[in-house]
């Protein structure tokens, strides 16, 4: 029996030397009672990182991974580095931390991290999006909702583009032709079809319709004033002469011409006013009431002064002076002065 064991050990040693020399698979034949034992327990081949252990009827077989060779350590066949360092020890020394160990994608609520051969990838949860952190690594950050993802600007047939404003939760809506941006009570902007009472202006800064102005703008009024011909003086000749009071006629020297006739005589040569005078008259129309009031006050003051002069002439009759009256006018009428003002006349300009 002892002789048999010695012969078996010699055969194993010889086959080991032949395998190391030729690189052929190694099989160990060990004595036993015929039962198949788990010869791979304890990872005799150095672990799954170094090689794979396969049970055989006579022992185990080591299939080493690339970069490792079969060797003998502590009288046991195993997979080891060519330099003689065991695979298990080498893996322990060269092992690096996993890419997802530092949670580069953020907390669990933000997303999950999955390791790859070249690094990791982040799968962000709802409400988060992919972004780069301060070190240039990919991570998941909170998504700033702008509403563009859910047709926040309106239906697709009404919206030309929807863009999220950087750094805010707002959005920029650009409506298509025949649509206009509207805002509701919640300050939400949407594109809706242009109502019938809307139209496009002569010039536009973008797409969509605009409301029609109920009143012409100042620019339009100026343009209409330039294109319209100036109106001629519609005052009838001799109208001021008919409105003059007897007292005013009595105080005028003979042969003099009324100021109104002189002014009309000077303006009669020009049938139309210049464009600048037309603008000034249009701009000054708002002050016509104030000017008319001032003129009326001035006329009342003049009438009071005329009445005072007439009174002084009357009172001077006691001194032997005669009161002069206008021919054809009674004394009672001369003491009462009536002032007539034509507010519709344009002579006050």
Swiss-Prot record:
All copies of the EGF-like domain together span: 36-80, 96-134, 147-192
Q: Where is this site: Cleavage?
A: 94-95
Which InterPro entries does the entry link to?
EGF-like_Ca-bd_dom, EGF-like_CS, EGF-like_dom, EGF-type_Asp/Asn_hydroxyl_site, Growth_fac_rcpt_cys_sf
Q: Where is this region: Disordered?
A: 194-291
In what way is this protein post-translationally modified?
Subject to proteolytic processing involving both the N-terminus and the C-terminus. The first EGF-like domain (EGF-like domain 1) is removed by proteolytic cleavage by ASP3 and is not present in the mature protein. Released as soluble 35 kDa protein after proteolytic processing at the C-terminus.
Q: Does the keyword Membrane apply?
A: yes
Q: What membrane topology does the UniProt entry give?
A: Single-pass type I membrane protein
Q: List the disulfide bonds.
A: 40-53, 45-62, 64-79, 100-113, 105-122, 124-140, 148-162, 153-173, 175-191
Residue segments, region Acidic domain: 204-283
Q: Which residues form the signal peptide?
A: 1-23
Subunit details for this protein? Interacts directly with MIC1. Part of the MIC6-MIC1-MIC4 complex.
Name this polypeptide is given:
Micronemal protein 6
Please name the source species.
Toxoplasma gondii
């Amino acid at each position: 029996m002892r002789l048999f064991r010695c012969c078996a050990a010699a055969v194993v040693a010889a086959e080991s030397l032949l395998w190391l020399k030729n690189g052929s698979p190694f099989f160990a034949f060990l004595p036993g009672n015929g039962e198949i034992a788990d010869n791979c327990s304890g990872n005799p081949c150095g672990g799954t990182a170094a090689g794979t252990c396969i049970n055989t009827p006579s022992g185990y077989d080591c299939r080493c991974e690339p970069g490792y060779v079969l060797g003998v350590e502590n009288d046991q066949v195993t997979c080891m580095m060519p330099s003689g360092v065991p695979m298990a020890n080498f893996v322990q020394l060269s092992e690096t931390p996993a890419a997802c160990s530092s949670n580069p994608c953020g907390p669990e609520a933000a997303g999950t991290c999955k390791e790859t051969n070249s690094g990791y990838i982040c799968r962000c949860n709802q409400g988060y999006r992919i972004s780069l952190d301060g070190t240039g690594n990919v991570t998941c950050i909170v998504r700033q909702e702008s509403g563009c993802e859910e047709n926040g600007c309106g239906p697709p047939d009404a919206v030309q583009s929807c863009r999220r404003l950087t750094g805010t939760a707002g959005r920029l809506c650009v409506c298509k032709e025949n649509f206009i941006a509207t805002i509701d009570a919640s300050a939400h902007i949407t594109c809706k079809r242009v109502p019938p009472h809307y139209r496009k202006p002569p010039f536009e800064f973008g797409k969509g319709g605009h409301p029609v102005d109920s009143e012409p703008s100042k620019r339009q009024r100026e343009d209409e004033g330039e294109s319209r011909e100036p109106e001629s003086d519609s005052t009838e000749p001799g109208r001021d002469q008919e409105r003059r009071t007897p007292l005013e006629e009595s105080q005028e020297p003979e042969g003099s011409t009324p100021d109104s006739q002189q002014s009309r005589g000077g303006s009669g040569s020009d049938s139309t006013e210049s464009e600048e005078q037309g603008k000034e008259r249009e701009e000054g129309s708002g002050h016509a009431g104030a000017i008319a009031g001032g003129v009326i006050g001035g006329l009342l003051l003049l009438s009071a002064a005329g009445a005072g002069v007439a009174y002084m002439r009357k009172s001077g009759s006691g001194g032997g002076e005669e009161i002069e009256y206008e021919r054809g006018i009674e004394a009672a009428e001369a003491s009462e002065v009536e002032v007539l003002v034509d507010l519709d006349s344009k002579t006050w300009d």
